[in-house]
Amino acid sequence: LSCPDQQITWLRNLLGNIGNVFHVGTEPGLGQSMKLANNLLSAAALAITSEAMVMGVKAGLDPHIMLEVINAGSGKNTATQDKFPKAILTRSFDRGFTNSLMHKDVELFLEEAQSLKVPTGVASAVQKLWQTACSEIGPGADFTTIVQCVENRAGVEVKGT
């Protein structure tokens, strides 16, 4: 949250039962900037993990073993710990967030970064993959279907056994 210091206790009491409450500052807009940064990291983690997993499976690696190794090392992230084992390897694609919403979040990050004159080379690449997911897989499809964009180009499917 971004709010005056004297309001944070009241807001923590009000919102603490429905989620984590962090006070990121007092200036208006800081909460939004924090949310955009977090959402970009989530989008990038899922996109890059999709590429890594597709490469590994195409090379002959077992996706379950890949996740076990990655999650024991420095590459672990929310995609490897949650989305791949629960929604992608199972092919359920059911995390409840759409490609269009993730694409919108990345677009909003890029707009904010541009207004602050922050370079966005990696974020721009992430945005392009989400745009592809919207056009090829569908804007209303679950955001975990982004792996299918990479799978389709590589000619391999990442799935559990």
Language-model-derived ranges and their functions:
Residues 1-34, 41-77, 116:
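Internal alpha-helical scaffold of NAD(P)-dependent oxidoreductase catalytic cores
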Residues 40-41, 54-55, 97-98, 135:
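A generic structural signal for short
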Residues 63, 120, 140, 157-158:
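Residue-level detector of short coil/turn "hinge" positions at structural boundaries
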Residues 141-161:
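Short, basic/aromatic-enriched C-terminal tail that caps enzymatic domains
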Residues 22-24, 100-104, 155-161:
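Electropositive, surface-exposed helix/loop patches at the edges of structured domains
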Residues 32, 82-143, 150:
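Interdomain hinge/lid region at the active-site interface
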